């Protein structure tokens, strides 16, 4: 599963916790991974992955987002990843829960 690969990879690269879902008592700073789409043709899989960076300030959420982008630029060094490109990234503050958040969306080709 591509989510597991990204989870393990980012867990070793980032200074904040990486999660695949919200848990009780989340820390002030963390990253969530979510697969938002994908397809498979001729044994080659493509996935769209959204990575949300949370923090107590908008500036810190933006910094974590930059760390995520820098880390994923290097994920192609893994054998199972052949391409990773940034689709978009933007301020995605959760106004309902009053939590600062940035989101980066990546298109990943993997085996």
Where are these regions (language model features)?
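Residue-level detector of short, conserved catalytic/binding motifs and their immediate flanks
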Residues: 49
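Short, charged interaction patches at domain edges and termini
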Residues: 1-12, 25-26, 36-46, 86-111
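Short hydrophobic/aromatic beta-strand micro-patches
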Residues: 52-54
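Short, conserved loop-to-beta-strand elements that form functional interface hotspots
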Residues: 20, 80-91
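Small/polar-rich, solvent-exposed N-terminal microdomains that initiate assembly or binding
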Residues: 1-41, 59, 63-70, 75, ...
């Amino acid at each position: 599963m591509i989510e597991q690969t990204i989870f393990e990879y980012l867990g070793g690269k980032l200074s904040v916790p990486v999660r695949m879902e919200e848990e009780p008592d989340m820390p002030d700073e963390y990253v969530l991974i979510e697969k938002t789409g994908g397809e498979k043709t001729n044994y080659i899989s493509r996935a769209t992955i959204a990575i949300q960076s949370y923090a107590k300030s908008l500036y810190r959420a933006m910094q974590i987002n930059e760390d995520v982008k820098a880390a994923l630029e290097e994920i192609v060094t893994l054998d199972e990843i052949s391409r990773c490109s940034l689709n978009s990234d933007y301020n995605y503050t959760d106004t309902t829960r009053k939590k600062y958040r940035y989101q980066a969306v990546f298109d990943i080709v993997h085996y």
